[in-house]
Amino acid sequence: MPDLISTEELTRLEHMIVYEKRAFSQGYQLIAGIDEAGRGPLAGPVVAAACILPKGLLVPQINDSKKLSPKVRERLFERLTTDSAVRYGIGIIGQAEIDRVNIYQATILAMLMAIQQLPVTPDYVLVDGMNLPHPDLPCLKIIKGDQLSQSIAAASIIAKETRDRLMCQYHREWPGYGFNQHKGYATELHLEALFKQGPCPIHRRSFDPIKSMLEVEIADDF
């Protein structure tokens, strides 16, 4: 049974497919939206998702993942990832690689990996807020793209929900930090645990205050 969509919601959703419609009118057929989750946290990976929605599909309530309640975000995640007409790929870059290349480059790597993981190759890519240097595909950077493009919003939901679930798994391995609550972000709870226990293996050594903590430890050894 098709979704019942209010006139107001239909108008909002129509505004969210303007970029996709423009790409379709230019002859592109497989248009991927791409977004990331986890650039700012002190711990855990950065996760990117690429998502290709079928032409004409409107997904009620879809929006920037950060604007959705956990319950709505989880429901939309399940809908997107179980719909055989929706194609998606996920890229995950862990803490060690983030520390090695920096978070910006790690985010690009995660996005490129997400495109590679798609079951089909897109011919056009809409990217949330970043210039993505793909060697073969035209990519359009859209500021606040997760609010302006349905494809990017879908990718943002898949990326965030995937990362949140990973952080809940990490909580079971390192329960003393509260990863299941803050997902690695620098909350008061997280910082208190970090200063009390020190960093665990998934903490980003190149991020402050962890970097400064480790520098002090090294200095104290001399």
Curated annotation (Swiss-Prot):
Residues 29-219 form the RNase H type-2 domain. It is found in: Cytoplasm. Coiled coil: none annotated. One of its GO terms (biological process) is mismatch repair. PROSITE patterns: RNASE_H_2. Its cofactor is Mn(2+); Mg(2+). The keyword Cell division does not apply. A divalent metal cation binds at D35, E36, D128. Keywords: Cytoplasm, Endonuclease, Hydrolase, Manganese, Metal-binding, Nuclease. Manganese or magnesium. Binds 1 divalent metal ion per monomer in the absence of substrate. May bind a second metal ion after substrate binding. Pfam families: RNase_HII (PF01351). GO terms for cellular component: cytoplasm; ribonuclease H2 complex. NCBIfam families: PRK00015.1-1, PRK00015.1-3. HAMAP family: RNase_HII_B (MF_00052_B). Endonuclease that specifically degrades the RNA of RNA-DNA hybrids. This is Ribonuclease HII.
